[in-house]
């Protein structure tokens, strides 16, 4: 099929550059989207142009000016030839999986300098304890998962160990010790109900504050970023128990290091409420069978399964109070000096 100055034949995306024909296998394209430039309308007549943007596994970027219809048809054909190719801007959306409700690909999130996180490289999640075989296959073959970072404590790992996926490297980096684990631990419904009466809402704010104030936790987040620095191929997935507190803060710190604006960081953080909604409904139904659901218990359930902007507020406030700025926190606490920051961005941005 021919689209403007390019064509697709025998599974290859073919185009001319510098008077030479180039053959790009469609299976090597990981991301493609439509880019609009210029402005339409307004007081003076202006124009916009549409381009097809293609990103390859080697992070090479190509842009071809085409009509909207040509772009649409071209993407459809390439997607048929390469079903694993990402199209459009998922922007940190949930990965549709059977057994993992809060697993997300940070791909396509935009940085302040206009770059984007590469899709299928950075994945945040909850526990992999009950991951289905279908979901394992998806992570292995579609996302090329190569590394898992477990933020849980040793006791949590023993109680609900990760399902080991062949060919994947595992790192245990407990963000908190057993004594300060608190509500971030996802226990059984009975355990949670017993703790609900003991844990005030203020505890959550203190918990988030400690994640960037406690020396142990800070060093563990530094280890997490170091794993990402030394990752060469495939996707990295990091998780805790529910994928909201320890993972939420770790993801926020990573996005800061990559130069993602705060507004986007907050949006990603708050998506947990949407993705854990069904888990919360299940818990409520379970407790209703025990005839022990009142308004106070309901409030505690929501406290556990939801996040608030205030939680991330206190993270940034604590960092500013202790280190003066996020830049100093990155440099002094997480060892993300300008050189390491640039290495990280070269690995995961395009």
Regions found by a protein language model. Name each.
Residues 3-4, 10-11, 19, 31, ...:
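Cys-dependent protein tyrosine phosphatase-like superfamily
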Residues 8, 23-24:
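A broad, structural micro-motif
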Residues 242, 246-247:
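Ser/Thr-glycine-rich phosphate-binding loops at phosphate-binding pockets of nucleotides
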Residues 26-30:
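Structured surface patches comprising rigid loops and adjacent beta-strands/short helices at the edges
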């Amino acid at each position: 099929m021919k689209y403007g100055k390019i064509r697709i034949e025998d599974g290859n995306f073919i185009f001319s550059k510098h008077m030479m024909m180039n053959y790009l296998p469609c299976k090597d394209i990981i991301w493609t989207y439509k880019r609009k430039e210029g402005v339409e309308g307004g007081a003076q007549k202006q124009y916009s142009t549409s381009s097809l943007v293609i990103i390859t596994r080697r992070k090479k970027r190509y842009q071809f000016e085409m009509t909207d219809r040509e772009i649409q048809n071209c993407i459809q054909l390439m997607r048929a030839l390469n079903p694993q190719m990402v199209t459009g801007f998922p922007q940190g959306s949930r990965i549709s999986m059977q057994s993992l409700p809060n697993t997300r690909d940070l791909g396509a999130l935009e940085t302040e300098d206009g770059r984007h996180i590469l899709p299928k490289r950075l994945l945040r999640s909850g526990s992999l304890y009950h991951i289905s075989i279908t979901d394992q296959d998806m992570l292995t073959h579609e996302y090329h998962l190569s590394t898992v970072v477990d933020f849980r404590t040793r006791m949590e790992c023993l109680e609900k160990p990760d399902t080991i996926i062949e060919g994947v490297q595992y790192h245990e980096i407990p963000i908190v010790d057993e004594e300060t684990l608190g509500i971030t631990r996802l226990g059984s419904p009975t355990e949670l109900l017993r703790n609900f009466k003991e844990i005030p809402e203020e505890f959550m704010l203190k918990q988030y504050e400690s994640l960037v104030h406690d020396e142990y936790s800070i060093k563990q987040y530094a280890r997490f970023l170091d794993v990402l620095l030394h990752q060469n191929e495939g996707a990295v997935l990091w998780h805790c128990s529910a994928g909201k507190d320890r993972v939420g803060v770790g993801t926020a710190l990573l996005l800061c290091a990559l130069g993602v604006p705060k507004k986007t960081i907050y949006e990603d953080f708050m998506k947990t409420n949407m993705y854990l909604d069904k888990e919360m409904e299940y818990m409520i139904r379970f407790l209703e069978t025990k005839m022990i659901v009142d308004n106070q218990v309901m409030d505690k359930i929501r406290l556990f399964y939801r996040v608030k902007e205030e939680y991330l507020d206190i993270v940034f406030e604590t960092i500013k109070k202790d280190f003066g700025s996020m830049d100093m926190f990155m440099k002094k606490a997480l060892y993300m000096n300008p050189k390491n920051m640039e290495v990280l961005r070269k690995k995961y941005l395009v």
